[in-house]
């Protein structure tokens, strides 16, 4: 049904995607300017799992929002030298999942976020064109939180219900679509755990 909202329910939260607006409930909405239209006729067919922490291995601050909205302050490198390497980037992701499972959405799912970079999936290049990017607040070597796995599985399920072009089998890591260039979500990410949760939620 066009414009319908699909939902999954758990004891913890409700994840709902409205395919009309491309928005996830209950995500906190933060508008990123780093977006554009997908190529005509292109639907989301892949979900890409990333990890991010700003500064590296530090969690809970405002810096991911600042990066994805191009509002890092000029003195950010004084806060941490790593910021000098990302000051001029224009990047985004559709969704961020914080350590406590909070959803933050930057780009509606029907639009193209700038998350994948040079990439290829099953021989098809330019993954930004046909993928949805989900960032987990974390790093390659540190275990992700149970709340993040629950939230990620719920988001994937809701996305698959809203966009039939997606499926739980078409979920890849950034390292899978950009091998040798990217390593996230890294060895700390428990893919079997995610697959088990997806079997429970997707059936």
Language model region names:
Residues 134:
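Conserved, mostly hydrophobic/aromatic
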Residues 2-125:
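N-terminal catalytic cores of peptidoglycan-degrading enzymes
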Residues 2-26, 40-41, 125, 130, ...:
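Basic/polar, cationic surfaces and motifs that engage anionic cell-wall
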């Amino acid at each position: 049904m066009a414009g319908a909202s699909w939902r999954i329910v758990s004891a913890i939260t409700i994840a709902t995607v409205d395919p009309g607006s491309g928005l996830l409930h209950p995500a906190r909405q933060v508008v990123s300017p780093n977006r554009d239209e997908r190529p005509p006729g292109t639907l989301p067919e892949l979900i890409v799992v990333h990890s991010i922490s700003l500064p590296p291995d530090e969690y809970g601050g405002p810096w991911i929002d600042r990066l994805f909205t191009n509002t890092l302050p000029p003195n950010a490198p004084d806060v941490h030298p790593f910021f000098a390497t990302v000051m001029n980037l224009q990047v985004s992701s559709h969704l961020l999942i914080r350590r406590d499972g909070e959803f933050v959405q930057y780009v509606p799912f029907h639009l193209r976020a700038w998350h994948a970079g040079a990439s290829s999936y099953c021989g098809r290049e330019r993954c930004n064109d046909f993928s949805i990017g989900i960032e987990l607040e974390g790093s390659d070597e540190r275990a992700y939180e149970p709340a993040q796995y629950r939230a990620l599985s719920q988001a994937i399920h809701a996305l698959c219900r809203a966009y039939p072009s997606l499926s739980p089998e078409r979920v890849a890591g950034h390292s899978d679509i950009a091998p040798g260039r990217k390593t996230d979500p890294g060895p700390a990410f428990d893919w079997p755990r995610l697959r088990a949760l997806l079997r429970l939620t997707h059936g």
